[in-house]
Design a protein with these regions (language model features):
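Non-catalytic, soluble scaffold/interaction modules
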Residues: 1-72, 76-141
């Protein structure tokens, strides 16, 4: 049996018992999204993107992405709305439980983005979206 620990939390876009497990893949731009789709490995990855206005993830959502994590944004953002429409678990404005860095609107958030990306990229995680407000990112070891 896998051991699980909560590594990060954020805003939950919608409540669901569906808890996808996959390897986190940071997608900084449309080229990275296209490359992942063309690799045939889309359904093995939880997608990590910078913001809730990241519309270039739309092709991945329509082709069967299993889960999304963002570093900023809110459930009311474009990506939050799309995740609900496609019923793809999505946790937004993720922050690490063991770090003081947080996203702050209007601030330079590069340190926060780098910390979360470094901690999650390449890790096998489960998205727990059972709570209506808070989504939990669980490290699966």
């Amino acid at each position: 049996m896998d051991s699980v620990r909560i590594v990060a939390e954020g805003y939950n876009c919608f409540e669901t018992d569906h808890a996808p497990v996959g390897t986190v893949r940071y997608l900084p731009d449309p080229k990275a999204v296209i490359a992942l789709i063309q690799s045939g490995q889309l359904k093995q990855h939880i997608l990590l993107a910078e913001g809730g206005t990241t519309t270039f993830l739309a092709p991945a959502l329509s082709l069967g992405a299993i889960g999304v994590i963002t570093l900023s944004g809110a459930p009311e953002s474009h990506l939050g709305i799309l995740s609900r429409e496609f019923q793809i678990p999505c946790i937004m404005t993720a922050y690490l439980g063991d770090s003081a860095t947080r996203y702050v609107t209007g601030s330079d958030n590069r340190e926060h983005f780098a910390a979360v990306t470094a901690a999650l990229s390449g890790k096998r995680v489960r998205l727990n979206c059972r709570d209506s407000d808070t989504g939990r990112i669980e490290l699966v070891e």
